[in-house]
Amino acid sequence: MIEATRAKLLATARRAFQHTGYAATSMDDLTASAGLTRGALYHHFGDKKGLLAAVVEQIDGEVDQRLNAISAHAADPWDAFRGRCRSYLQMATEPEIRRIVLQDGRAVLGPASEAAQQQCIASLAALLQRLMAGRIIDDADPHALARLVNGSLTDSAFWIADAPDDTPRLEQALQALELLLRGLLRQ
């Protein structure tokens, strides 16, 4: 019952935050839509900001699963790394990710938690280590390189999400990403 209540609040909040935005979402309307009380919201999440943090964490987890699946199904380590980077930028145009994670989440919650950043960096570092071991890219500290790549992808995703029309920025970012990634390849 407790998990069902939590899941219902998260699902209702995701819909409301995506369509209405965090600031315009009324907690009374949200809990009424979920068929629950404000007390249930406060019990599970503390407040509206806590609910947003839980929604962002849930979406981040789903993004990570999608990126891991892309890496796992790629033909080779280079395609895994490249596909993961490209997909991350493309996800910045998805309405739910764009509004909840990249716009409202950043504005209300601030930068991503250190734990979330470390998870992304560790995944990228593992891919980069495989590329170095396979002599596909030149040797460097994989964690330092992962931080640089993660930082550029994250900042580019915010830039894409903040655009009034995301298509030109996405295409520009993907083109720039290809240039950056080609620069990593061993000559």
Q: What is each model feature region?
A:
Residues M1-T20, A24-L36, K49-A53, Q58-G61:
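Basic, helix-initiating cap at the start of DNA-binding domains
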Residues T5, K48, V55, I59, ...:
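Hydrophobic/aromatic residues within well-ordered alpha-helical segments
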Residues G39:
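Key DNA-contact positions within bacterial/archaeal DNA-binding proteins
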Residues Y42-F45, K49:
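A short His-aromatic
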Residues A54, N68-E96, L145-V149:
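Hydrophobic alpha-helical connector segments
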Residues G61-D64, L109-I136, H143-R147, E171:
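Amphipathic alpha-helical packing segments from all-alpha helical-bundle domains
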Residues S87-Q90, I121-A133, S152, F158-Q187:
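C-terminal peripheral helix-coil segments that are non-catalytic and often amphipathic
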Residues M91-P111, F158:
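Amphipathic alpha-helical segments used for helix-helix packing
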